A protein has these predicted regions:
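Preference for well-ordered, secondary-structure-rich cores of eukaryotic proteins
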Residues: 10, 99-101
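Short acidic DE-rich linear segments
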Residues: 105-106
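Active-site-flanking beta-strand signature of metal-NTP-handling nucleotidyl enzymes
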Residues: 3-9, 52
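An amphipathic, aromatic/His-enriched active-site/gating alpha helix that lines ligand/cofactor pockets
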Residues: 21-40, 44, 56-94
């Protein structure tokens, strides 16, 4: 049974292209540090957008291990700081965890 984590970012008006670049850089950094794939989705219209940063884990324990690993890496901390404060790219982030019940791709 896998766990999917979705972090939903609310993108500030006029910052869509910058946020796409920032999240793409973060996904590459995430993969380098953790070995885990990340998928980025965009939802919205006009100037109102949300972007999802999605990663799948084998268990809740793995989510905690990976979280500890990335937060211990200064590059991730700097990346978060750049997007949230310095870059003013997002106005909020919400984490959600989903347990897979069935996946026909398996």
């Amino acid at each position: 049974m896998s766990i999917t984590n979705s972090r939903e970012f609310t993108i500030n008006v006029g910052k869509i292209a910058e946020a796409e670049k920032w999240l793409s850089e973060g996904a590459d950094l995430w993969k380098e540090i953790t070995g885990k794939d990340a998928v980025i989705y965009k939802e919205g219209w006009g100037d109102q957008y949300k972007m999802l940063f999605v990663t799948t884990y084998e268990s809740m324990g793995e989510t905690e291990e990976v979280g500890d690993k990335v937060m211990a890496d200064k590059r991730i901390v700097d990346w978060i700081q750049n997007g949230m404060t310095n870059g003013d790219l997002i106005s909020g982030a919400v984490d959600r965890f989903f347990t897979t019940i069935k996946d026909t791709r398996e």
